Design a protein with these regions (language model features):
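A gly/proline- and charged-residue-enriched helix-loop-helix capping module
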Residues: 132, 137-138
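Acidic, low-complexity proline/glycine/alanine-rich linker and hinge segments
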Residues: 67, 138-139
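Short Pro/Gly-enriched beta-strand edge/turn motifs at strand-loop
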Residues: 81-82, 151-155
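A generic local secondary-structure boundary/capping motif
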Residues: 87-88, 141-142, 157
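Short solvent-exposed loop/turn micro-motifs enriched in small/polar/acidic residues
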Residues: 91-93, 137, 164-166
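Extended hydrophobic
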Residues: 153-190
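Intrinsically disordered, low-complexity terminal regulatory regions
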Residues: 1-126, 184, 190-212
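Soluble sensory domains of the PAS superfamily and closely related sensory modules
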Residues: 139-151
Length: 212
């Protein structure tokens, strides 16, 4: 936690400010506030702290030398990527970053709908190549990977401060035999968080599954 940390910057949004207070208390060793932070997020915070996780934007994204192209990943990138592009075109007046990952959180596809005026808060999301908990701490993709169900994280529900101005929404993608093969989601700035975004992530997930 930075020395200049100030939880009052979200004073106009009590929900986000509550997350900030819970996070700052946890980071100071004052325990978890279970009235504000869910069990899944609290457990993820504890794993990050106990494992001394450091933010790793690049992650471990390289394939094994000589490894054949993963047709499943190619399918997710092409099919899911096109669906995300279509949605972001419809959201042209807003600020979103759409993402497809593998089942572990490695980014396969990423796209913003605000190329001409890309939000400074979203720039860091575009740089992340691996959303697994071990590389990016607590985030919507790491929690989907852990729980195998749609998840949203907003503001200081994330473990790392670079996410605190953002809200993320992600859903799992399952194969025909019910194995999770990837994840799809969207990030926006926290002030524009809304549960309808999670419904879009679920809709894309189901459309991808129907294309398998």
């Amino acid at each position: 936690m930075s020395q200049s940390y100030n939880p009052f910057y979200n004073i106009e949004n009590p929900q986000l400010m509550g997350y900030e207070y819970a996070w700052s208390s946890f980071m100071r060793g004052q325990g978890l506030n279970n009235a504000i932070i869910s069990q899944e997020i609290g457990q993820s915070w504890e794993r990050c702290r106990n494992g001394r996780i450091q933010m790793n934007f690049k992650g471990n994204t390289s394939n094994t030398p000589g490894e054949a192209p993963n047709t499943q990943e190619t399918f997710l990138k092409q099919t899911g990527g096109k669906m995300i592009a279509d949605i972001l075109e419809a959201w042209d007046n807003d600020c979103f970053y759409g993402i497809i990952t593998d089942a572990h959180g490695k980014k396969l596809f990423g796209m913003s709908n605000t190329h001409r005026n890309f939000s400074k808060k979203l720039e860091k999301v575009g740089e992340i190549e691996d959303f697994s908990e071990g590389c990016a701490g607590t985030n919507c993709f790491s929690l989907v990977s852990e729980t195998c169900r749609p998840f949203a994280t907003a503001g200081a529900q994330h473990y790392f401060e670079c996410f605190h101005g953002l809200a993320g929404y992600a859903a799992p993608i399952f194969s025909a035999n019910y194995q999770m093969i990837g994840m799809v989601g969207f990030y926006t700035i926290a002030e524009r968080m809304d549960e309808y975004i999670l419904s879009f992530a679920v809709a894309v997930e189901r459309a991808i599954e129907n294309s398998l």
